[in-house]
Amino acid sequence: MVTMRDLLECGVHFGHQTRRWNPKMKKFIFGERKGIYIIDLQKTIRYFRYTYNIVRDAAAEGKSVLFVGTKKQAIDAIKEYAEKCGMPYVNHRWLGGMMTNFGTIRQSIRKLEVIETMEEDGSINLLTKKEALMLRRKKEKLIATLGGIRNMKSLPDMIFVVDTVKEKIAVQEANRLKIPVVAPIDTNCDPDVVDYPIPGNDDAIRSVQLFCQEMAEAINEGKSLLEQDGGEQAAGEEVSQDEKDAVVAEAMSEEDFGEDEE
């Protein structure tokens, strides 16, 4: 479990400039130095350990935790530690409705499965070169946006978010669906939208890595208490020819499909 030394070495105590703050964070601020707010690490470690236990206990009950973080400093850590604890993640772009319109998201994941099946059974080679190219482009885009949640068959029981300001849509969806939110909260954040806040720096790479690492450790500790591996997955649904045809037609209709989105 995290120590005070860990927090100091990773710069968890450094907040934002004093002109960029949320007054609701006042109770978590120790002071100010050179125009930067300093977060009270005594409170951080208390909230950190409490939240660690909450996440561990959730995992021990077989609950799922969705990792969310799409900014540059979080992309790698979110993927790395979500995979280390076998949890779903979003680290590319949060699609509006990813949770509130989950049925549609599952349909898109199904399209990814159809394309991969076509590659495996060779049926993609029966298409024209252009059709095959468009399908592969569609596959790459689906993997980028949905690859981390492709095995998430239902809504998560909890979400862990890095930067609740940037990921406000994800947080809003979780709040609407009564899905508990776990998150580090920097001095510019609103703690009221987070069920299990941990006051701390959500910008520095080492700080972000520490938060992700601790959440993964809590989950793995909880999973070990389940006394079951949980790694067995149900067999995928068989892909029909109609599904293949529909995905090809959709890919061919997306003329601007290869363009990057910001």
Curated annotation (Swiss-Prot):
The keyword Plastid belongs to this UniProt entry's keyword annotation: no
Region annotated Disordered, chain positions: 223-262
Alphabetized SUPFAM superfamilies for the sequence: Ribosomal protein S2
Compositional bias ranges of the Low complexity kind: 227-238
Keyword Secreted: no
UniProt GO cellular component terms: cytosolic small ribosomal subunit
PROSITE patterns per the UniProt record, alphabetical: RIBOSOMAL_S2_1, RIBOSOMAL_S2_2
Keyword annotations: Ribonucleoprotein, Ribosomal protein
GO process annotations (BP): translation
Highest taxon above the source species: Bacteria
Biased composition (Acidic residues): 252-262
GO MF terms, alphabetically ordered: structural constituent of ribosome
NCBIfam families named in the record: rpsB_bact
HAMAP family attached to this UniProt entry: Ribosomal_uS2_B (MF_00291_B)
Protein name from the UniProt record: Small ribosomal subunit protein uS2
Organism: Campylobacter concisus (strain 13826)
Gene name of the record: rpsB
